[in-house]
Amino acid sequence: MGTSLSKTQLLDSMRNEQAAWEALLDEIGEAHMTQPEVAGGWSIKDIVAHLTGWRRRSVRRFQALLKHEADFSPPWPPELQEDDEINAWIYEANRDRPLAEVLSDSREVFQQLIKTLDAFSEDELQDLRRTLGLEEEQVSGSMFFAHFHQEHEPDMRAWLEKVKQER
């Protein structure tokens, strides 16, 4: 396992990632979060809801692991299996929700993730690498934000720069 992070280091790393995420949202500003066309027709609010939906799945998965349950229920209908259909479901489930609710939900689900991971012992947390099939990857805070960094952050930052130039 080598240089695996301790639980404290992992949770601190995740909190730092969340702080950077919140700073980006603050920079964007709530007034701009419902404007479409940030990425594929989605607004910042839609991206927040999307990331929250998938993070909620992670929380449920970790809660099941904590209880030594083999299976868990995703937050979407179980017949949905493909990412695109899950993403469409998340979008439809959240598109008419108020921005304040979506942002609050995002923060609440992050806190649930922290609380759930904190409930694992150090040894159980280190075993998550094997459980999740991450033999070559260290469980870290950035791992929980990888999808955001790879798939959404570039679009959000490019859109933000465009908005800044128009101000």
Give the role of each language-model region.
Residues M1-A20:
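Extreme N-terminal tail/first-helix region
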Residues G2-L5, I86-V102, L132-G141:
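Acidic/His metal-coordination segments adjacent to aromatic residues that form catalytic metal sites
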Residues M14, Q18-W21, L25, R55-S58, ...:
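Hydrophobic alpha-helical core bundles mediating ligand binding, dimerization, or RNAP-core interactions
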Residues M14-N16, A20-D46:
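Long, hydrophobic N-terminal alpha-helical segment
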Residues T34-E85, I114, E122-R167:
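Short, contiguous alpha-helical
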Residues E82-L125:
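Acidic/histidine-rich alpha-helical segments that form the ligand environment
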